[in-house]
Amino acid sequence: MDNGIAGIDHIIIGVRDLEAARRQWVRLGFTLTPRGRHIGQGTANYCIMFGRDYLELLGFVARDEHAHRLENFLAQREGPMAVAFAPGRDAAATAAELAARGLHPSTPRALGRALELPEGAVTPRFSLLNLPPEETPALDCFICGQLTPKLVRRPDWLSHPNGVVGIKTVHLVADDPAALAPAYRRLFGDDRVAATLNGVEIDTGRNRLIFARPSLSGTDGPPPAITALELRVASRDAASVYLKNAGIAFMGLPDGRLAVSPAEATGTSLLFGE
């Protein structure tokens, strides 16, 4: 039975200074969209668009008494804070498919943001739904349907000097990864959740989630948390040359991936691999 989820739509990265974050990620070799302002809220974002998914740098630009999730996260740290999954068709259809699996999705709700383009503001719109925390344990997530995809995927926003082309894997830490498996089998299906020596690996449809114990994740932060974002590059060698020329501190791992420390990316550990 299809669960109505077609992989990851985007990753939210919470930042304390949105403009400083923009400069930092441009230095890392990413092309950023113009700034978007969430309608009726004190939050704004810059997005890093790929062909099928993206990264969202999210921060405050005004006082917001309702954005408690972001406020609480930033009181502790910066970095990746949530995963948004993509619906296979639309949020309403995904809600029906999840309910048919015995899950408890919320009613889809609307969200819009004013995107500040040189020729004037446009309004990308989205349809969001949530699942109860116990149905996606150790993961802050929701489902985000793109209602106006052409507004946010302009060709010139999809090309990045560092050669990144998409999200490959989200690495997470949890106290007991094996205990998470039943919930994610219910969400994604038995054939898409695998126990590993280090924890649990989940096939979301076009990306992976990997949960590991703190001692195996290499993170100093308390679980549960996203510990690293693994991004796919067109050429690892070209990415290495770009990072060297930009003065970005990174190291090569034994498996060939390139690791950029959180200090270079607003609290986000980045892995670049083919």
Model-found features: residue ranges?
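Short acidic/glycine-enriched loop/turn segments that link adjacent beta-strands
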Residues: 40-44, 254-257
